[in-house]
């Protein structure tokens, strides 16, 4: 694990230096940019907000810090991707007659490319933020020979990732979509939490929203790799408050079918903190 972390830190540092040097070169095509330390501070500190937010106690402030850091990381990664793509295109163009034209190396061209890279990074990130708040519904029709489950409607949702960024507001939209399906049984297929249960800034409100799920046969869940261990007391208390039954290597039978919930293979015990 230490070797992996060191490798990730070095990779991130290299990416920051690469983007920073390209950004300085771009900014100097528009004005006399001398205070480069400001750019380096921004590039280093903004992504760290995501880590700092996770270290704070669950609150609206911690949520704002974490979301700001998360969005900053997203914008940075897309700018890194588009910058690398622009450099690759420029490298390939050097092999063509286009590279001999004065416009190829002009400040105007560099300025335009930098603006395009920045605009693409911001726009793609904005699309991701908007899309993340959208609940998509997909319908599958399944026929079972010799089964008495004709007309049975099952609603399955996964990856709620409750935590410092996602809480009751997102659960309200999800529950409204689930209830609109008028399902007979509801299944939550893992990753109910993003990490620790107590990271959720409005845990009680989120549980109250999930308790609104209306289904004839109940609401059932299994755990995913992001969830704490099944024996973690805060997790058990949350499921009880939300009216959700956890199936941890358990099965429940109904007329015509049996619902089986497998345990998460990478089980974590103890205090249940962190991911499994």
Regions found by a protein language model. Give the residues of each.
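Non-catalytic terminal accessory segments
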Residues: 1-132
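Short amphipathic alpha-helical coupling elements at transmembrane boundaries
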Residues: 63-67, 142, 176
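Preference for short coil/turn "hinge" residues that link or interrupt alpha-helices
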Residues: 122-123, 128-130, 135, 153, ...
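A broad, low-specificity signal marking well-ordered, structured residues that form hydrophobic/aromatic
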Residues: 124, 140, 257
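Alpha-helical transmembrane signal-anchor/signal-peptide segments
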Residues: 132-147
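Soluble catalytic domains of enzymes that build or remodel membrane lipids, polysaccharides, and related
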Residues: 143-276
């Amino acid at each position: 694990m230490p070797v992996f972390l060191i490798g990730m830190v070095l990779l991130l540092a290299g990416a920051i230096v690469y983007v920073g040097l390209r950004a300085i070169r771009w900014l100097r095509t528009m004005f006399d940019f001398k205070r480069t330390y400001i750019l380096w501070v921004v590039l280093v500190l903004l992504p760290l907000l995501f880590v700092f937010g996770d270290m704070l106690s669950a609150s609206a402030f911690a949520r704002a810090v974490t979301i700001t850091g998360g969005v900053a990381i997203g914008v940075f990664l897309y700018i890194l991707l588009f910058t690398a793509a622009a450099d690759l295109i420029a490298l390939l163009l050097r092999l063509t007659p286009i590279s001999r034209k004065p416009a190829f190396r002009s400040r105007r061209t560099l300025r335009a490319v930098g603006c395009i890279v920045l605009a693409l990074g911001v726009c793609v990130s904005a699309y991701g933020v908007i899309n993340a708040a959208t609940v998509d519904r997909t319908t599958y029709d399944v026929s079972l020979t010799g089964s008495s489950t004709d007309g049975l409607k099952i609603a399955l949702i996964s990856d709620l990732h409750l935590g410092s960024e996602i809480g009751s507001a997102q659960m309200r939209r999800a529950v409204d979509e689930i209830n609109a399906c008028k399902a007979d049984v509801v299944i939550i297929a893992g990753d109910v939490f993003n990490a620790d249960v107590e990271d959720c800034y409005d845990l009680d409100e989120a549980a109250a929203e999930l308790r609104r799920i209306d289904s004839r046969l109940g609401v059932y869940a299994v755990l995913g790799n992001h969830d704490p261990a099944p024996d973690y007391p805060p997790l058990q208390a949350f499921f009880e408050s939300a009216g959700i039954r956890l199936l941890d290597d358990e099965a429940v039978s109904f007329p015509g079918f049996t619902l089986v919930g497998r345990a998460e293979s990478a089980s974590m015990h103890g205090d249940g903190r962190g991911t499994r």
